[in-house]
Amino acid sequence: MKYKDLRDFIDLLEKRGELKRITQEIDPYLEMTEIADRTLRAKGPALLFENPKGYDIPVLANLFGTPKRVAMGMGQEDVSELREVGKLLAFLKEPEPPKGIKEALGQIPVYKQVLNMPAKEVKKAPCQEVILQGDEVDLTKLPIQHCWPGDAAPLITWGLTVTKGPYKKRQNLGIYRQQLLGKNKIIMRWLSHRGGALDFQEWCKENPGQPYPVSVALGADPATILGAVTPVPDTLSEYAFAGLLRGSKTEVVKSISNDLQVPASAEIVLEGYIMPGEMAPEGPYGDHTGYYNEVDDFPVMTVTHMTHRKNPIYHSTFTGRPPDEPAILGVALNEVFVPILQKQFPEIVDFYLPPEGCSYRMAIVTMKKQYPGHAKRVMMGVWSYLRQFMYTKFVIVCDDDINARDWEDVIWAITTRMDPARDTTLIENTPIDYLDFASPVSGLGSKMGMDATNKWPGETNREWGEPIEMDKATKDRVDDIWQSLNIL
């Protein structure tokens, strides 16, 4: 299941009943959000608004509104198959030499996939069929959603931002929200630890006072979009990972105004620069926490060129109290995370990010405990191994007899296997999401680890409780007569 571009994916979704075309006039101001929100909560299809009020460009929404569609976007038929994607990433993150001929032969398919990694630069691309520059650029002609009543302005939500630092060979792809500021101005809301912000900081040191080139792709193919939100190893580019998912090299084209490579099949591309020191207050916006966030200053991007396909499609989403698309992406990508964590911590049985925890703020881990203090080691590992979890506020560790995805099981473990003073680990002054207004300082807060495992000698002086369980013989006898009892 491979897609050349977003339009291929739309066609397949429609054939499978996973996409609904809406011909009625719908307003990008609030109405699209309400319709997409109701559709997502009902586990409904992707939506193609063909008649946005006041615009002649259709809007694609709720594209990744179910875990199944996320898996399809990664070239898989089912969410369970994403474990294989995670295993591939784990191998690429820490490759191991084969232990023999048989194992070497077994790795051949992986190396064949690796051949699809290098991006392929093309001279002519669909994303540059129409080129606008200078005064021709008018971002207000795009049907950018105004998602919530208290939002400051329309917000670009699926912009795939392409940057490059002065010391790095490869480009960085990241998805950062962008507030519409004017006909040719947007605010780039990237947090200081994110790849784009780090590239910009390095540029400012190396080229003080010089404009920093940036390109933003809208409506890239699913593999490239998802490559930008997946925990790819630092040595692997997002374009390379997209090639692995797609089974063919990612086609890119040089931007018109700079040397950055953008997805050749993207629907719309914004090109321009950020002038060091040019900042603007961003927000407030309703975000994935379910609240409006604080206003803060972020860099301003001046758009000098806008290129697009003929009859482009604008890809959009909203963020709000879970479930929203980021939460659904988290559920699906959870399956990618598990093998990566297990590669480093083989004792981990399962790892779960409950969507109601705003995608990443709470993690539940089940493990095969092997020694006193083992749960705390796993907690620290989760917080430190992948940068995706540096903002995870709560980590709950349970034994492998607990189902990490069943709250009844987890709550039972917490209330019966934990002593709050002994089994709670608090760490202060750690990086926290800037959108987390509960932290005492913006971007800096605390983390809590909860050891809900059975305690070993050395962790307790008391005789530990033995779980109640009926013997198998009795269960079997009752199974035999259960239907005849006619109780239920």
Curated annotation (Swiss-Prot):
Alphabetically ordered keywords of this record: Cell membrane, Decarboxylase, Flavoprotein, FMN, Lyase, Manganese, Membrane, Metal-binding, Ubiquinone biosynthesis
E.C. number(s) listed in UniProt: 4.1.1.98
Lineage, broadest ranks: Bacteria, Pseudomonadati, Pseudomonadota, Gammaproteobacteria, Alteromonadales
Disulfide bonding pattern of the chain: none
Annotated protein name in UniProt: 3-octaprenyl-4-hydroxybenzoate carboxy-lyase
One of the GO biological process terms: ubiquinone biosynthetic process
Principal EC category: lyase
Record's keyword annotation contains Metal-binding: yes
Recorded GO MF terms: 3-octaprenyl-4-hydroxybenzoate carboxy-lyase activity; metal ion binding
Protein location: Cell membrane
Function according to Swiss-Prot or TrEMBL: Catalyzes the decarboxylation of 3-octaprenyl-4-hydroxy benzoate to 2-octaprenylphenol, an intermediate step in ubiquinone biosynthesis.
One GO location term (cellular component): cytosol
Cofactor mode of binding and number, as noted: Binds 1 prenylated FMN per subunit.
Pfam families named among the record's database cross-references: UbiD, UbiD_C, UbiD_N
Subunit: Homohexamer.
Binding positions for prenylated FMN per the UniProt entry: I175, Y176, R177, R189, W190, L191, R194, G195
Catalysed transformations (reactions): a 4-hydroxy-3-(all-trans-polyprenyl)benzoate + H(+) = a 2-(all-trans-polyprenyl)phenol + CO2
Record organism: Pseudoalteromonas translucida (strain TAC 125)
